[in-house]
């Protein structure tokens, strides 16, 4: 069951969004579909965010004939102090979570299995990187209507292809994959554009009580956390659409 997100409804959220399954023109039957707004709060560095997003996408696809979903991507930084050289991922996880070699191997096996279940392939992910510039590019892509595609491209680049999501060339390549103007993408990266907007959004979600990701906030009132199976998301969407919450 979804839980209430502490004070989420009180905070001003970003206006940018990528609307999933929005029809060009609604038939009378389609126009009666209830609409749910989903804010997917996540960090590119978070592997469970890749699992959670793919599971959520499956759930949205299952309910698309009955429920209209507006999907917004919101930023969160797991490692805001991470330097430009990054850190070895195994050393980072052992230090941060107190894992031993056996625990780390088991956790990675579980993650790979869960990824396979939702159609996402995890690669090596040899280092942990700073993701602030990735969040800036996701924000910019949202203004162009490509926020969802950019989020997917960055998750793929890091978690599947072991590329640095804070590297300029990787970011430009992701923009190219999303059919965005690469010259404009480079200008955004080099100028520090949208830093203030991203920092504001980060603060909003921290003040709203978000402390871990992925966090899926539905209608700014109901919170589901973690890389849940698609069925959990589907059940929540159907219940909330039915109750009108």
Language-model features: locations:
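Structural alpha/beta surface segment adjacent to cysteine/selenocysteine redox centers
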Residues: 53-161
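C-terminal cap of thioredoxin/glutaredoxin-like
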Residues: 5, 16-20, 24-28, 33-65, ...
């Amino acid at each position: 069951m979804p839980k209430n997100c502490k004070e989420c409804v009180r905070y001003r959220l970003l206006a940018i969004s990528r609307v999933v399954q929005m029809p060009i023109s609604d038939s009378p039957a389609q126009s009666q579909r209830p609409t749910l707004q989903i804010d997917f709060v996540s960090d590119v560095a978070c592997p469970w965010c890749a699992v959670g997003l793919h599971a959520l996408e499956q759930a949205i696809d299952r309910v698309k004939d009955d429920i209209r979903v507006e999907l917004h991507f919101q930023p969160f930084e797991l490692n805001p102090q991470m330097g430009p050289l990054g850190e070895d991922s195994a050393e980072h996880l052992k230090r941060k979570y107190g894992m031993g070699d056996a625990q780390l191997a088991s956790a990675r096996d579980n993650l790979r299995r869960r990824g396979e279940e939702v159609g996402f392939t995890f690669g090596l992910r040899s280092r942990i990187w700073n993701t602030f510039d990735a969040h800036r590019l996701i924000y910019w892509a949202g203004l162009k209507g490509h926020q969802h595609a950019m989020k997917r491209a960055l998750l793929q680049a890091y978690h599947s292809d072991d590329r640095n999501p804070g590297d300029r060339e990787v970011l430009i390549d992701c923009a190219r994959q999303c059919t965005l103007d690469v010259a404009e993408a480079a200008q955004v990266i080099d100028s520090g554009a949208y830093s203030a907007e991203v920092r504001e959004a980060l603060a909003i979600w921290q003040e709203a009580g978000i402390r871990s990701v992925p966090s899926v906030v539905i209608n700014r009132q109901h919170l589901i956390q973690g890389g849940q199976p698609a069925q959990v998301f589907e059940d929540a969407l159907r219940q909330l659409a039915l109750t009108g919450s």
